[in-house]
């Protein structure tokens, strides 16, 4: 009888300790992605795929080709080596606006406006056209741009609603 109690206590002790070891105290997975590019600079991960919040823009501000406030965005370049290539141009592409092929079209429930992209001097950048060359420095560099929503003109009806637009960028080093 005494032996049975000892055996029962031993089985319970080992059973409880194995349950404690089996408890999930956290787990996960780390996936590393990227690409190797033939360029004098690396593109910072936060610049490769970003979202620019345009905000809630009054339809009145867009009447007759009116513009929203510009929203700045950057393309950050890292570890640049300018020993051979010293400048970079940026080309933005995307679905062009039906009202103005130089601007980026919007999709969604909103309509009657388009996205304009500008360089750091507030000069409009036409879709599919390279910017003026920007001089690079060794190390890290920041390419500054801005975007604003622009009404499609006097004859356009600006319809309130949500919108999105996607622009791809390509860098070319000289």
Curated annotation (Swiss-Prot):
Database matches in SUPFAM superfamilies: Bacterial adhesins
Keyword field contains Disulfide bond: yes
Major site of localization recorded for this protein: other
N-terminal signal peptide: 1-22
Localization of this protein: Fimbrium
One Gene Ontology cellular component: pilus
Biological processes, Gene Ontology terms: cell adhesion involved in single-species biofilm formation
Alphabetized Pfam families for the sequence: Fimbrial (PF00419)
Disulfide links within the chain: 41-80
Keywords, comma-separated and alphabetical: Disulfide bond, Fimbrium, Signal
InterPro entries: Adhesion_dom_fimbrial, Adhesion_dom_fimbrial_sf, Adhesion_dom_sf, Bact_Fimbrial_Adh_Pro
UniProt entry tagged with the keyword Signal: yes
Job description of the protein: Major structural component of mannose-resistant fimbriae of Serratia marcescens.
Recorded family membership: Belongs to the fimbrial protein family.
Name used for this protein in its record: Fimbria A protein
Organism: Serratia marcescens
